[in-house]
């Protein structure tokens, strides 16, 4: 069964565009076995903060778990972690939610 992981970022108002632009350059996730795709979305009409969701689609939950343990993951997130600890980080909060994909259709 296919698997999806959502990383929901709550951001300082006005910073979503900069966060989304970071994804324009791939950092190796696309090379991993089991990776099927990614969507980076911005929730519309948030008044007090910005919200960005990073949705990754995998062939299986195991493929996602393998990515979390990979050097590719560590390299792509090493600067994110240090910025989160910095008070100037635009990231207020994040939450990871996972899903089994029961059905999908894309044209």
From Swiss-Prot:
> Ranges for the ABM domain?
3-92
The record lists its disulfide bonds as: none
Q: Which residues bind heme?
A: 22-29, 77
Give the Enzyme Commission number: 1.14.99.48
Site residues, Transition state stabilizer: 67
Q: What are its GO cellular component terms?
A: cytoplasm
Provide the primary localization.
cytoplasm
Tagged with keyword Cell cycle = no
Annotated compartments = Cytoplasm
Residue numbers binding Fe cation: 7
Q: Which reaction does it catalyse?
A: heme b + 5 AH2 + 4 O2 + 2 H(+) = delta-staphylobilin + Fe(2+) + formaldehyde + 5 A + 4 H2O; heme b + 5 AH2 + 4 O2 + 2 H(+) = beta-staphylobilin + Fe(2+) + formaldehyde + 5 A + 4 H2O
Top-rank taxon, per record: Bacteria
Q: Which GO terms describe its molecular function?
A: heme binding; heme oxygenase (decyclizing) activity; iron ion binding
Question: Which terms does the UniProt entry file under GO BP?
Answer: heme catabolic process; iron import into cell
UniProt KW Oxidoreductase keyword: yes
Q: Which UniProt keywords apply?
A: Cytoplasm, Heme, Iron, Metal-binding, Monooxygenase, Oxidoreductase
Q: How changing residue 67 to A affects the protein?
A: Loss of activity
Cross-referenced InterPro entries, in alphabetical order?
Answer: ABM_dom (IPR007138), Dimeric_a/b-barrel (IPR011008), Heme-degrading_MO (IPR050404), IsdG (IPR023953)
Record NCBIfam families: PRK13312.1
What family does the database annotate?
Answer: Belongs to the antibiotic biosynthesis monooxygenase family. Heme-degrading monooxygenase IsdG subfamily.
What's this chain's function?
Answer: Allows bacterial pathogens to use the host heme as an iron source. Catalyzes the oxidative degradation of the heme macrocyclic porphyrin ring to the oxo-bilirubin chromophore staphylobilin (a mixture of the linear tetrapyrroles 5-oxo-delta-bilirubin and 15-oxo-beta-bilirubin) in the presence of a suitable electron donor such as ascorbate or NADPH--cytochrome P450 reductase, with subsequent release of free iron.
Q: HAMAP family from the entry?
A: Heme_degrading_monooxygenase (MF_01272)
Other noteworthy facts: IsdG seems to carry out oxygenation of the heme without the assistance of any of the prosthetic groups or cofactors normally associated with activation of molecular oxygen.
Q: How does it assemble?
A: Homodimer.
Q: What is this protein called?
A: Heme oxygenase (staphylobilin-producing) 1
